[in-house]
Amino acid sequence: MIKHILANLGFLLQIAGLLTVLPILVGLYLNETQTLASLFLTCICFLACGFLLNALCERKDLDFKSSCVLILLAFLLMPLIGAIPYFYNDSFNSPNLADRFTNAYFESVSGFTTTGFSFMLNSDALPKSFLIYRSMTELMGGVGIVFLLLAFFHSRKSLNGLGNALGIERIGGNLKGIFFSVFLIYGVYIVVFTIVFYLLGSQDIIKTGSFVIDTITGGYQPSLEPYSSIPMRICIILLMFVGSVNFSLNLRLFTLKLKKALSKEILLYLLVIIFGTVLILFLTRRGALTSLFHVVSMSSSTGYDYIGIPAIDETTKSIFILL
């Protein structure tokens, strides 16, 4: 059983290693030497461990117990390897090695689980390749969980049932194909919205790409100050929405099955957003767009805020908590 678990874990580690190539390319282009060394080491560790596990172990279907072990191992080992750049660069100015390791592992776990907690006082000051890597960990963990969920559904009958829930009519047995299709769709979102933000006036395309990843995964919270125009905030609302809905909506939009895209769950979510927006607008008098922005932010667990939620009244806070 343990070999089957390790083989599946090896596949995830290989994906993480491949995704680390992007920040490496950014670092090479910008000549960020110190950060590059840590990123190269991280990439090699991910790929070496992944290929080793795949070479020594044969991947087979997992039962429920094995899948639980896989999830635990993935969210322990991936952040451990992913903590190398944080530890190497010591972005926290830690007083000793123990604190440096603890801070690095905490930051890495926060990224891979898309929790978004951070000890960094000014993440925008990080080297750009490091900033991209930090955002990519959210993509590894956030999208990687799709594969982990697929591991629960080990029989063909269960896989087809999951396929219907995801909006994939024929899932077959090609789990890797499904996994890459998820990456492809979210990759298109990231590229398109990065270009749109750049055309709308964002000056730094690399930081913009990092911001888009942070928004669609609902993890780290970068500064909203560079994205304060109305068109940009509308784009942020769209990003938060597509990042929070069921994958079936995104898949059907890409396959132009628009009639099937509006499922009962999506319609209910839209009604919650509309009702919440009207309620917040009535209570705060902040404007329709501002109310909509914060309702989508809270209901999608993104957590963006530019009105100062800690200072508003308790009734409005309670509504945001419910959302």
Predicted feature residues:
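Membrane-proximal intracellular helices of multi-pass ion channels
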Residues: 1-323
